[in-house]
Structures are given as C-alpha cells and as structure tokens.
From Swiss-Prot:
Superkingdom field: Bacteria
GO (cellular component) term, any one: transporter complex
Organism: Pseudoalteromonas translucida (strain TAC 125)
Family the UniProt entry places it in: Belongs to the LptD family.
Gene name of the encoded protein: lptD
Biological processes per GO annotation: Gram-negative-bacterium-type cell outer membrane assembly; lipopolysaccharide transport
Any Pfam family matching the protein: LptD_N
Protein name from the UniProt record: LPS-assembly protein LptD
Matching PANTHER family: LPS-ASSEMBLY PROTEIN (PTHR30189), LPS-ASSEMBLY PROTEIN LPTD (PTHR30189:SF1)
InterPro entries reported in the protein's UniProt record: LipoPS_assembly_LptD (IPR020889), LptD (IPR050218), LptD_C (IPR007543), OstA-like_N (IPR005653)
HAMAP family attached to this UniProt entry: LPS_assembly_LptD
Cleavable signal peptide: 1-19
UniProt entry tagged with the keyword Signal: yes
Reported function: Together with LptE, is involved in the assembly of lipopolysaccharide (LPS) at the surface of the outer membrane.
C-alpha cells in the first residue's frame, strides 16, 4: 500500500552537493562507480511518498510501517524493513537492512534515526560510497545534515578492492558541502592495511575549491644535493590572494625556503617569488644565496598598460647550481624591465626601464634609464600610400664600460606604397634614419666620439607572387602553391665605429631573416645594403585544407663589395657574404612530423647552422622525437648535438619516458633522463633517474673539465587526498636541460 504524508521537514534533508569530478574509470573500471540517484517521478517539494507492506496508525500523529518500506522525497530515498514516524515530534526511526540514497551518496546501514525538526539523519553501522567522486568507507555512525556528512569511527578511501591500496581511519571524518573539503581527527593512514602515518588533523579536497594545507611532497637523491625533500604548503589568504611556502631541504647544501605570492585585483595581476638559502654547506664562501622574481601586468584605464618583469640572483651560478621555477638553468642572462604604455587612436607610446643581468664572466650590459619610444599606429594615408613616423629617446648607463653614459635620439619617418591583389603584392618603402648620440666616459685614445650624428636613407622594394594548382603528387585531391619572393634593399655604407653598442645585437639569419630590412635588433648599427634577395616557398594542402608540406629557400645577392657584411667592419658575430637559407616541414601522416632548416655560406662552402627534428605522436601519450642541431659559432665555439625523447605507454597504468642528448663535438653524453610512471584512479607515483652536465658560467668547460650530476627523484600521490587531475608523463621530459617541445603543426 502507499500513503503520502505532508511532513514538510523531510523536504529539507539533503546531503552535500559536491562538484563533479572527472572519474578515471579507465583505470578502476566500474568497481567503485555508484549508480546516480534520481528522485521518484512526480514528487514535488514538501511531499513524502511512503510505500510498505503494512501500516499501523498510532494515534493521529504517528504511524508504523513494516515490510519493504520505501520512503521518497525530492532529496533522498530510503529503503528499510520497518519505519516509525512521529509527526508531532518530528522523528523518524527505521531498522534494517537500510539503504539510504541521495544525490551524492549511497549508505547501507543497520539503523536510522532522523530529527526532522533539525534536518539531520543518523545512520548506524554505515557503509557508504560517493556518487560524484571516487570514495567509499565505513562508519559506526554517519550523520547527514545541510552542511554535509559527519562520520564517527570511520574510514575513507578512493581505491577499489577489499584491501585498498590506501585508506584513512579516523575517530571523526567530516565531509563539508559548504567548504568543499574533508577533514579528519586522530587519523591513521594505512597502506595495504598497514599503518604508516598518524595524523592528528588532516584535510583533503572534495572539489576544486582552494584551501590552505600541505601539498604533495617530493623526494630525491643526487650527487649535488644529497637527500632532497620538498614539502610545499599552500596558504589560501583570500579569494584573490594566495601563497605557496616551500621548505626545500638538501642534505649537502642546507635548508632553502621558497615562497610564491600571487595576487589579482581589478587593475593588477602579479606574482612575487623569493628563494633564500642562508648558507650553502657545500661552499660557505658564497654566503647568502637567493633569487627574487616579480612579474605584474596592470590595466590602468582604457588606454594605459603597465608591466613589470624582474628577476635577480645572488650569484652567477645560482640557476645552474640550485635551479628555479622562474628561470632555466641554461639561461645566461636575466631580463629586468618595467614599462608603461599608452595606446591612443593614432600613437602608441612606451616608457621602459630595462636591464639584462649577464651571468658568467662576461661584460655587463647597458641599462636603459629610461627608453621612451613612440610609434604611429594609424599612419596618414592616401589611396595606397601611407606615411608614418616612429622614434625613441634613450639614456644608457654602464659603470664598467668605456662609455659609462650615453643618450640616443632616433627618429624614423617612413613613406610606403602597398598594393595587394589575390595573386600578387608589391611594397615599396623609403625611410630616413636619423640618430644622434651623446656619449660620456674616458673616451680619449679610443675610437668613440663624444657627439655623433648619423643620417642614413633606406629603400626597400618587395614583391610576392602566389600560384596555385590542383595536384595528385604525394597526396590525393591536393592543392600546391608556389610563392616566389623578391626583395631589393639599399642603405649606404657609413663608418659607425665611433658609436658604442648599447642594445644592439645581430639577428638570426634564417629564411625569414633574409627578407628583413635590417640585420640588427637595435639602431646602434645600421648595416649597409645594396642587395637582392630571391626566395620561394611551395606548400601542399590536403583535401581538408590542412598543410602537409612546405619548403622554403632563398639567398642574398650583393651588388657591391662595400655592402657585403665582411667588408663593413661592424662589431658583430661572424659575417657571411653569400648566405643561403632553407627550411621545410613534412606532415605526411597525422602521427608523423618532420621539420628541418639550414643556413649555408656558399662562398666559404660551409654550413653555418642546421637543425632537423623528426616527431611521432601516437595515442595515450605515446611519442618519439629525434633531433640534431649544429652551429659553427656559439660564443666562439662550434656545437653539434643530437637528442632523443620518448614516451611509451606500457599499459593503461604504466608509462615509460626517456631522453638522451649527446655532444658530438666533444664526443660525450650531456644529459640522460629516464623515468617510470604508474597511475590508477586512487594513487600514482613517478620515479626518474637523471644525469646531466654541470655548467660553471665563470669558466669555459672543456672535455676534461666537465663534471656531471646524477639524481633520482620520487613523487608519490594518493589520489582523492589531493589533486584529481591526471598526471602527464610528458612533463617529466621537460625537466632536463633540453626540454621536450611539442611540434608546432602536430595538432592531434
């Protein structure tokens, strides 16, 4: 029989509504997946549907139901053998076996007591499982109220099986719907039913909301650091403020404190990182060792932007010796800049203060204090003609240089004619480069002048054609393009040896560099030019219009000897008079990708630079990458290196990764990395072995001087007590000197 009782208080009984989390049933199958609960169709808020084999009325306010009792509301359902409801006192008692279900949990117990007036349900001898995340356990007493679940003498695990890999047993476990966190009191962590750790108080997440607490620690051992433990603590200061405080203990160096503070306001977002080691036990003469990093972006009204990016270290070998999250151990200089930008309708103005901290035994760079630059973003236009002006005012200082102070004023008016059609385009530019210098220092007996004025015209003519045809070569129903390019560039030759080098460096001579209108990044050197550049690109597109192949090649042809780089006497890197550059990409299969490039001196019959990379990317994090690179001049030395990256899934749970890099010039390995990762739905671990060359930036390391560091690192995570996101084994390949980089065109 069935009878509906108007007990309104039952309508407010509900369990915590936990945020949905992606369940990794790929690993655990459906052994822990509890069927999602749905309310009885037709029920409305405040209604109670009670069905039983028999019912006995005990006066006007109470009733006893017996035999296959089912009680349903819009928030929960209850199955029991008997149930006694006292409407006047607001009490519900049921005896078992009992099954209680709601949106987030399913509980089997021997008895149930409900205080309807206080919206609380207590179940005795409970075995529970969660429906919106992996989790199960037992409790002598389980209480459900509006805030969540409270379990007494209880257990919790996210692992399947009769003997879970890990479980928490505690005097009390609270699962809070309001805060999204669970907390335990007097808990013991068991691994394979063996107690391993006592936790007086412990918290863990139920959804993605942030809360202060310890994060997953990591452990490693290496020649350089000895035994290393990293134990981060997360501090959720406010919704827009947080910090991570990380003690890092190294048995051979000491205790380092790493802190990171993040903030977000309506106008600013930023990060401040500080790393500090009071004394390096391996080299006490170094004193305090530290790193400071500050990065901020500011939005100051509609047209104003500000940026800060500052990194500073205590000594040149800090990065190579201690590593950091804010810079790479391969960095040889640190960027420090602050800028204020105004973006108007016609002009963009930047006020910048910048400096490079050069690491190692090298000359210090100049500091720009400040540099004010302006660019016309909306040129004056007439038909296909436009006219624009750009320029800058900069003041440089460097106490260790011959020129210790300098002021540079540069202005560059430019007239352009730009005409474009579908099949071709033509561009002509005429510029006047006017630069004035005031240079101060002990200049007597040097080539530098105190005052310099330099005026140079520049003419650039550029045209490109676009041909297209259907093709069946190498690909069905494909399209091939041919894009020849031609450029003429003229700038007269002028002796610039009386000008210092303040912020100017030689640019890369790749295929795209052949068609630039300058060889340098700054204006302290303006290279003479009287040259044609001829090049072409061909591409293949499949029937889905995806690019599967391209090849580009080009060369500069000089019309006068004075325009050749070796004849200009510029203080720059090695110059080449007949530079040929080519590059290619082949993506013949969705899993395969090949890229290569070369720069060749046709006069000297030598390769300047070359690189080639072959990538394979399969399913489930399967990848292989082979690479080779060569350069005839890197800080005065030739380098030739080859490398291998691989990530192989052994099974659904196991992943193997490895990388190897070799210095062919000196015939030695420079980095070896191998690792193994296991991940299931309830726990994961990573173990890596790493051997790499150690660099001392204060000296040149030859083959006999090279030293190596070997290390083993272990990360262990109990899933369900921390982040629920899946691990990515490829991230292990990014930890070394030569980090893995995903191929640009590989989209699958």
């Amino acid at each position: 029989m069935s009878k509906t009782w108007g007990i309104l208080m039952l309508s407010v009984l509900s369990a915590p509504s936990l945020a949905e989390t992606e369940l990794t049933h790929k690993f655990c199958g459906t052994s822990m997946q509890t069927r999602a609960w749905q309310p009885l169709p037709g029920l409305k808020l405040g209604m109670v549907d009670i069905r039983a084999n028999d019912v006995e009325l005990l006066g006007t306010q109470s009733a006893e139901f017996t035999g296959n009792v089912d009680i349903n509301t819009v928030n929960m359902s209850l199955s029991a053998q008997t149930a006694l409801i006292d409407k006047q006192r607001g009490l519900l008692n049921a005896t078992g076996p009992i099954t209680y279900r709601d949106k987030i949990s399913e509980v089997n117990s021997t008895g149930l007591n409900a205080d309807l007036n206080n919206s609380a349900i207590s179940l005795l001898g409970a075995q529970y499982s969660l429906t919106q995340q992996l989790g199960k356990g037992g409790a002598e007493k389980l209480t459900v109220d509006e805030s969540g679940l409270m379990l007494m003498n209880a257990s919790f695990t996210a692992c399947p099986g009769e003997v879970p890999v890990w479980a928490i047993e505690a005097d009390e476990i609270n699962l809070s719907r309001e805060e999204g966190w669970g907390e335990t009191y007097n808990a013991v962590l068991r691994i394979l039913d063996t107690p391993v750790l006592y936790l007086p108080y412990f918290t863990f997440p139920l959804d993605e909301r942030r809360k202060s607490g310890l994060l997953t620690p990591s452990f490693s051992s290496s020649d350089r650091y000895g035994l290393e433990t990293i134990t981060p603590y997360y501090w959720n200061i406010a919704p827009n403020l947080d910090a991570t405080i990380t003690p890092r203990y190294m048995s051979r160096k000491g205790l380092q404190l790493q802190t990171e503070f993040r903030y977000l306001t309506q106008e600013h977002e930023g990060l401040v990182g500080i790393e500090y080691l009071n004394k390096d036990d391996s080299d006490p003469d170094l004193g305090d060792r530290y790193m400071f990093h500050w990065q901020q972006k500011s939005y100051l009204g509609e047209n104003w932007r500000a940026n800060v990016d500052i990194t500073n270290v205590s000594d040149d070998n800090y990065l190579t010796d201690l590593d950091s999250n804010y810079a790479s151990k391969t960095d040889t200089q640190l960027y420090r800049t602050g800028s204020l930008t105004h973006m108007g309708d016609t002009w963009r103005t930047d006020i910048t203060v910048q400096n490079f901290e050069v690491l190692g035994d090298h000359l210090e760079s100049y500091t720009a204090l400040p540099q004010i630059s302006f660019t016309q973003t909306a040129p004056w236009q007439y038909d296909n003609f436009d006219f624009s002006v750009s320029g800058e005012v900069s003041h440089f200082t460097n106490s260790s240089a011959i020129i210790d102070q300098a002021t540079r004023i540069h202005i560059e008016p430019k007239a352009r004619f730009d005409y474009k059609e579908h099949a071709w385009s033509f561009l002509s530019e005429v510029s006047i480069l006017q630069t004035n210098y005031k240079q101060h220092g002990d200049l007597e007996g040097t080539q530098y002048s105190e005052s310099v004025s330099r005026t140079l015209p520049k003419v650039r003519l550029y045209t490109q054609l676009n041909f297209e045809r259907e093709t069946s070569y190498f690909i069905d129903d494909g399209i091939q393009t041919l894009e020849p390019q031609l450029q003429y560039l003229y700038t007269p030759n002028e002796d610039q040896s009386d000008i210092g080098l303040f912020d100017t460096a030689k640019l890369q001579d790749d295929f795209f560099g052949l068609f630039r209108d300058t060889r340098f990044s700054g204006v302290d050197r303006i290279a003479a030019a009287n040259q044609f550049t001829l090049g072409a690109t061909t591409r293949l597109f499949d029937k889905k219009h995806q690019e599967v192949f391209n090849f580009s090649a080009g060369q500069i042809f000089y019309l006068s000897d004075s325009a050749k780089p070796t004849e200009q006497g510029l203080n720059s890197d090695t110059n080449y008079n007949a530079l040929f550059a080519a590059q290619t990409m082949v993506h013949w299969h969705r899993r395969w990708y090949l890229s290569a490039g070369i720069q060749y001196d046709t006069d000297g019959k030598q390769i300047i630079q070359s690189n080639v990379t072959l990538d394979y990317k399969g399913d489930d994090n399967e990848l292989v990458q082979l690479n080779h690179r060569y350069s005839d001049d890197v800080s005065g030395n030739a380098i030739e290196q080859t490398g291998l990256f691989t990530s192989i899934p052994v099974s659904d749970e196991w992943q193997f990764i490895a990388s190897y890099h070799r210095d062919l010039e000196n015939n030695r390995s420079i980095e070896v990395l191998s690792g193994l990762q296991y991940e299931s739905c309830c726990w994961a671990f990573q173990i890596t072995g790493h051997r790499q060359i150690v660099t001392d930036l204060n000296q040149s390391i030859g083959q006999q001087q090279a030293t190596f560091d070997s290390s083993i690192r272990l990360n262990f995570v109990l899933k369900g007590l921390g982040s629920k996101s899946r691990y990515d084994a490829k991230k292990l390949l990014q930890q070394g000197i030569f980090g893995y980089r995903r191929p640009y065109f590989l989209n699958d």
